[in-house]
Amino acid sequence: MLKLGKVETYIHEKLEREKLHFVLLDPDDVSPELAGELASMSEEVGVDAIMVGGSTGAEGEVLDSVVRAIKESSNLPVILFPGSHGGISKYADAIFFMSLLNSRNPFFITGAQALGAFQVKRYGIEPIPMAYLIIEPGETVGWVGDAKPIPRHKPKIAAAYALAGQYLGMRLVYLEAGSGAPQPVPPEMIGLVKRVIDVPLIVGGGIRTEEQARAAVKAGADIIVTGTAIEKAGSVEKAREKLEELNRGVKG
């Protein structure tokens, strides 16, 4: 019988009480030392989990050392957010086992997943099946993943894909505008998607301010992902201020 793993159970239990804030760290952009520092700070501020990964696909020792540093510095769950099948580290707690549903390339829909599946099993990492949708502009991830980004003014297309993902058995839906996107996913799109699906909705990309985080949550997002705004804050003090600001937007 299929039963939910520890991290997925943690997500569902926390969602019964509040909206969640995940911080995404890209091993291409942060050293293990900085990753550890940001993770420990995230935990103090009230962030709920750390995601590790990026579209250009850091792997091997670079990825492992960042995941290890995070595990040593905080008690937050570490969830892999792989750009491809190389983005797997045995030190992580869970992996968003995701399919880029609006890719034009079957490699990003099921190919990379097949190549990584046995490794996930061998390492005993908890897989969390997720439908991943790229919304305009899509940024680097849209280009790398050969996506056909969903137009910002077509929420119904996003909702159709999201519902298809749920019906295919995926237990989370992620709307992604792309790291560093000029604007986040539009609230109208978040709202429509949330109305049609029954699984938790994650929204990320372009969320830089308390107001943007609050607007996404108000529209229906269950989990907000931030990353670039924190990584690019300029100093550790500024990163903490930005984290606190974004967390206020999510938690209210």
Curated annotation (Swiss-Prot):
Alphabetized GO MF terms: imidazoleglycerol-phosphate synthase activity; magnesium ion binding; phosphoglycerol geranylgeranyltransferase activity
Keywords associated with the record: Cytoplasm, Lipid biosynthesis, Lipid metabolism, Magnesium, Metal-binding, Phospholipid biosynthesis, Phospholipid metabolism, Transferase
Compartment(s): Cytoplasm
Biological process according to GO: glycerophospholipid biosynthetic process
Major localization listed first in the record, in broad terms: cytoplasm
Signal peptide as annotated in the record: none
Name this polypeptide is given: Geranylgeranylglyceryl phosphate synthase
Organism name: Thermococcus kodakarensis (strain ATCC BAA-918 / JCM 12380 / KOD1)
Higher taxonomy: Archaea, Methanobacteriati, Methanobacteriota, Thermococci, Thermococcales
